[in-house]
Amino acid sequence: VESAEYAHYKNAGYSLEAVNWWVYEKQDVSFDIVPPWTTNNYHWWITKLYPGQYMPMHTDPHTHDSPCKRYWMPLQDHQPGHIFIYENNLVKDYKAGDLYSYIKSQDMHGAANIGHTPRVVLQVTEFI
């Protein structure tokens, strides 16, 4: 089933067959991450964008069904060409381990890597 967001991307000229990024979740790795800032149920994943990869502006479907808080944590210091935007905010000059909280859980966000090294971040959804 094609989502309205997917149709919007296609109408804007994106070829989503050419868009890819790597996602690592708990079941994909041999470790767990327990965010120290929450005691509620949560879901985490790590995204990795290689140079030339991007994620169009989007919302995450799992934030549409229940109240939640969203967090974004870079796992490396900001590097030239590593781009993260949520709503009208360009996040830059960050350090590995900095924690950013979305203003609203369904804020539009997107990322790109026009640099020369992989871009790796942790994303956490806390269900409240």
Segments (PLM) and residue ranges:
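Conserved metal-binding segment of the jelly-roll/cupin
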Residues: 92-108
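Conserved short histidine dyad/triad with adjacent acidic residue
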Residues: 46-66
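Short, conserved beta-strand element in jelly-roll/cupin
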Residues: 48, 64-81
